[in-house]
């Protein structure tokens, strides 16, 4: 890395922070996340009804989740924190979307591995 004085960053660089809270079930991760100010929860499982926070209907597909993000990007709102709850329930939605888009039976299909590893 070459360095010069004009590469010095002054002050605070404002960027969105990304946080993942990981732990065993029933620890209170969703409750903690939902208790933050100006938060919107995007649930991917139907286990957050007891949490007192703003939340979308349960996302049943990747398109549901992306639809929420699309609206949040286009429309004015006061949310400062977006909570995707939970990532382990979102992962199969993402896999399903990728398989549908790519015509794969599954992400672990041997043919897909060969196709994915080919250089284009």
What are these regions (language model features)?
Residues 89-120:
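P-loop NTPase motor core
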Residues 2, 6-96:
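Conserved P-loop
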């Amino acid at each position: 890395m070459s360095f010069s004085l004009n590469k010095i960053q002054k002050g605070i660089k404002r960027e969105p922070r990304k946080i993942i809270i990981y732990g065993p079930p029933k620890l209170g991760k969703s409750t903690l996340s939902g208790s933050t100010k100006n938060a919107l929860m995007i649930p991917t499982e139907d286990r957050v009804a007891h949490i007192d926070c703003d939340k979308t209907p349960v996302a049943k597909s990747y398109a549901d989740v992306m639809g929420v993000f699309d609206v949040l990007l286009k429309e004015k709102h006061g949310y400062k924190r977006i909570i995707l709850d939970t990532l382990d329930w979102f992962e199969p939605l993402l896999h399903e979307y990728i398989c549908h888009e790519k015509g794969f039976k599954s992400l672990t299909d041997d043919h897909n591995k060969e196709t994915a590893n080919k250089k284009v």
